[in-house]
Regions:
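Intrinsic low-complexity, intrinsically disordered or marginally ordered coil/linker segments
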Residues: 1-166
């Protein structure tokens, strides 16, 4: 018996295999409003409390997520990579669940801008971003943007990126 309330994805194609997975992908890619002014938030915005980068040590899938808040202009872009997430959409779901718990709901919405993999070595202060997301597709500039964000947020880190590989 399969639990259709748990998102399932194809290991080879990244395709959503059940209704829960399809709903998660739709949520992650929908944009009721698309913000082009990422980072220009009101001074009192709750989004200013959100860490811009969270990376698990090791090599894992990552997603680049644009966050907005209902009733506010502006947006932030965050990078998330969790060791417990097998799929890019799982990283999105984990981030949104975490934000809901930390911020108490507060009308925060997320939209996946892209994803790939990140090799993170905290000990040597290195991060390398590469590949793409089978679920969300190739997104030009995504890996470069993620690497720039990581380098900006992680002081003293050496970062690199490539669009090669999966």
């Amino acid at each position: 018996m399969t639990d259709h309330s748990i998102p399932r994805f194809c290991e080879h194609t990244g395709e959503a295999l059940n209704a829960a997975a399809l709903a998660l992908v739709r949520e992650a890619t929908s944009a009721e409003r698309v913000e082009q002014n990422a980072g220009k938030l009101p001074e009192d915005s709750i989004l200013k409390k959100v860490p811009i980068v969270k990376l698990a040590p090791g090599t894992w899938k990552y997603v680049l997520i644009q966050l907005t808040r209902d009733g506010e202009d502006g947006a932030i872009v965050v990078v998330r990579s969790y060791a417990h997430c097998a799929f890019h959409a799982d990283n999105f779901a984990a981030c949104m669940r975490e934000l809901k718990e930390e911020l108490g709901g507060k009308g925060v919405r997320g939209r996946v801008l892209g994803g790939g993999r990140v090799r993170h070595d905290a000990e040597s202060k290195r991060a390398f971003v590469y590949g793409y997301s089978k679920t969300f597709g190739r997104t030009p500039g995504c890996n470069e943007r993620a690497a720039v964000i990581i380098e900006r947020e992680f002081d003293g880190y050496e970062t690199g990126w490539s669009d090669d590989g999966y």
